[in-house]
Amino acid sequence: MTKNTSLTIFMVVLVIGMLYTSIFIKYSDRTCHVYIKAENCEIDQCNWECGTKYKRVGVQGLCVPPGFDPIDQACLCSFNC
């Protein structure tokens, strides 16, 4: 192989690696949120429902808005996209 061909192949591999790394880093830290309607929001039930529905690492359930009666709250699931 000539010097130019080797250099071209090296540059193409380098650029593809840089693009892959930047895309992976860009989308790996995003957090998604989904509301689940509940008749009576309880934190343990909310965590369990979120964990079974979204089987991912870092799933957390929270009853929102805080300070309201459980009947008026909804379950907010947060997880890594």
Curated annotation (Swiss-Prot):
Disulphide-bridged cysteine pairs: 32-81, 41-63, 46-75, 50-77
Q: What keywords does the record list, in alphabetical order?
A: Antimicrobial, Disulfide bond, Fungicide, Plant defense, Secreted, Signal
Instruction: State the signal peptide span.
Output: 1-21
**Domain of life of the native organism:** Eukaryota
| Keyword Disulfide bond tagged | yes
Primary location group: secreted
Check the record and name the Pfam families matching this protein.
SLR1-BP
Q: Where in the cell is it found?
A: Secreted
What GO terms describe the biological role, i.e. biological process, of this protein?
Answer: defense response to fungus; killing of cells of another organism
List the InterPro entries hit by this protein, alphabetically: DEFL
Where does it sit, as one GO cellular component term?
Answer: extracellular region
Family of this protein:
Belongs to the DEFL family.
Name of the protein: Defensin-like protein 130
Which species is this record about? Arabidopsis thaliana (Mouse-ear cress)
> Where is the organism placed in the taxonomic lineage, from the top?
Eukaryota, Viridiplantae, Streptophyta, Embryophyta, Tracheophyta
